[in-house]
């Protein structure tokens, strides 16, 4: 199964992950997860990239979004790690239009935390469980956070961009 294979690819590179940063650098009281930017030699996860490219083309045809690039990384939240309330594209400054999270871990229980908490355009909050093999897509300007995880939580986080990625 694809999800299992990409999970194994992620885990095989876990020693290469680095502390995730925000614009101001590594700030552990805002973000404590670890990431590894996807590289062309990651052949299994490259299929995820291709799927997002096809999805981007469909969005462009339907909504004229002008998506040109995909920026993505593996993300690992160890027990006790989180990402505080933020927007992936504050004030439409960085070209990120659609955010995507694809959950890679093999199993998940509701009491393990690690939920994505997301505020919609009407101000309503939604809690999304990080279920294995689930993909979540949302507008990058929406306020959201990752609640404290009690177990290792793995994902591919991606952004569909209207400009060239900065990494």
Provide a role label for each language-model segment:
Residues 29, 61-66, 89-94:
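Short, conserved, surface-exposed binding loops centered on an aromatic residue
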Residues 73, 99-103:
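Short, hydrophobic/aromatic-rich beta-strand segments within well-structured domains
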Residues 65-73, 112:
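A short coil-to-beta-strand element that immediately follows conserved catalytic motifs
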Residues 49-56, 67, 97, 153:
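A structural signal for well-ordered alpha-helical scaffolds and beta->alpha junctions
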Residues 90-91, 96, 105-167:
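Catalytic core of Fe(II)/2-oxoglutarate
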Residues 42-45, 74-93:
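Conserved short histidine dyad/triad with adjacent acidic residue
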Residues 1-61:
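Non-heme Fe(II)/2-oxoglutarate
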């Amino acid at each position: 199964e694809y999800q299992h294979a990409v999970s194994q690819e992620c885990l095989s590179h876990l020693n290469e992950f680095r502390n995730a940063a925000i614009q101001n650098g590594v700030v552990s009281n805002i973000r404590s997860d670890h990431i590894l930017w996807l590289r062309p030699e990651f052949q299994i996860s490259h299929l995820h990239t291709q799927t997002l490219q096809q999805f981007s083309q469909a969005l462009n045809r339907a909504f004229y979004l002008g998506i040109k690039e995909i920026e993505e990384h593996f993300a690992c939240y160890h027990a006790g790690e989180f990402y505080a309330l933020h927007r992936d594209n504050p004030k439409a400054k960085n070209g990120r239009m659609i955010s995507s999270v694809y959950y890679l871990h093999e199993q998940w229980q509701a009491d393990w935390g690690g939920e994505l908490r997301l505020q919609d355009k009407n101000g309503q909050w939604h809690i999304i469980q990080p279920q294995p093999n689930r993909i979540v897509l949302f507008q990058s300007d929406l306020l959201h956070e990752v609640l404290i995880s009690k177990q290792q939580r793995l994902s591919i986080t991606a952004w569909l961009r209207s400009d060239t990625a900065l990494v």
